[in-house]
Amino acid sequence: MIREIDKNYMKLALSLAKKRKGYTHPNPTVGAVVVKEGKIVGLGYHEKAGKPHAEVMALGQAGEKAKGATLYVTLEPCTHFGRTPPCTDAIIRSGIKRVVVATLDPNPLMSGKGVEKLRNAGIEVDVGVCEEEARELNEDFFTYITQERPYITLKWAQTLDGKLATLTGSSKWITSKESRKVAHILRREATAVLVGVNTVIKDDPHLTVRFVPTEKQPVRIILDPELEVPLSAKVLNTEEAPTIVITKKENEKAEKLKEKGVQVLILKGFNLKNILKKLKELEIMHLMVEGGPRTLTSFLKEGFFDRIVVFIAPKIMGEGLSIGDLGIRSIEESLKVRKKKVENLGEDLVIFFKRY
């Protein structure tokens, strides 16, 4: 039976999981709490892929006190050998009496298997405590598993009249330092950041996390069908972060890019569906698309997005570049999104949207 106290302990487990948001890819972000006789005896979170899972960390901290205790975990414990052994085996060995799970594994081949194994071992299992919060925490992982592609965030900065750049392509800087700091937090949570080659040519960005502390850098991906990227571009400095150039050309320039440590992916079928399929194979779980207007338009037009984050500055540009033609000819055909959150960032606004 689920009680109010179960929700409190699960919220603690969720807060532990959030500490590692962005660092566990391609694994989910998971937290765990072990409670015995009303006292917390073990806390854990999954640090990164290849490291012990949250349940194992919490059980290790609890030690002998795990016998007869309750384990709270934000995602169904795994039953398979991956980078680490199954968590269900560790739970059964520990002597845990009850397990409370926030949400089931999204993989249809695995969903419910962990719960079933624990119940077959005589352990009481309850599922669905803080489920909505747990699913939202790992929405990137759920999409990655169920859609067979990365979770996609489209992010852009615009003026009050909806312009993303001037007619010459200039976009530095539309928004404030406060907005750029939040943008770097979003980068930190992503597995990879993607731009079109025009953005590299016009802005020469680093595409790294710089304004906030970080333990890792996202993979930088450039869509460059004709291999136009300048060899002097900052994004090609692979000492800062890994870089992938996706193209349909195979020539001498591709070899020069490889010499610089850049991974060059040559796709004959150069389209978003094939690109996203390849990125899934490369374990890119959360892809943040940062532009420019042409690249953002292509993702919107083909419906490849899960979240949109728009930074709005109190500036009016008049003529300029904005989201392009989506093939929409009536208001009824407009892409509809759901507002999730609005924040004030100095003079700017940032609005988070989810697709319906």
From Swiss-Prot:
Residues that hold substrate according to the record: 171, 187, 207, 210, 290
Pathway: Cofactor biosynthesis; riboflavin biosynthesis; 5-amino-6-(D-ribitylamino)uracil from GTP: step 2/4; Cofactor biosynthesis; riboflavin biosynthesis; 5-amino-6-(D-ribitylamino)uracil from GTP: step 3/4
Swiss-Prot/TrEMBL keywords: Hydrolase, Metal-binding, Multifunctional enzyme, NADP, Oxidoreductase, Riboflavin biosynthesis, Zinc
Domain CMP/dCMP-type deaminase, residue spans: 4-126
GO biological process: riboflavin biosynthetic process
GO function terms (MF aspect): 5-amino-6-(5-phosphoribosylamino)uracil reductase activity; diaminohydroxyphosphoribosylaminopyrimidine deaminase activity; NADP binding; zinc ion binding
Domain of life (superkingdom): Bacteria
Binding site for NADP(+): 157, 173, 199, 203, 292-298
Gene3D superfamilies tied to this protein: Cytidine Deaminase, domain 2, Dihydrofolate Reductase, subunit A
Cofactor note: Binds 1 zinc ion.
Cofactor(s) recorded in Swiss-Prot or TrEMBL: Zn(2+)
Protein name according to UniProt: Riboflavin biosynthesis protein RibD
Organism: Aquifex aeolicus (strain VF5)
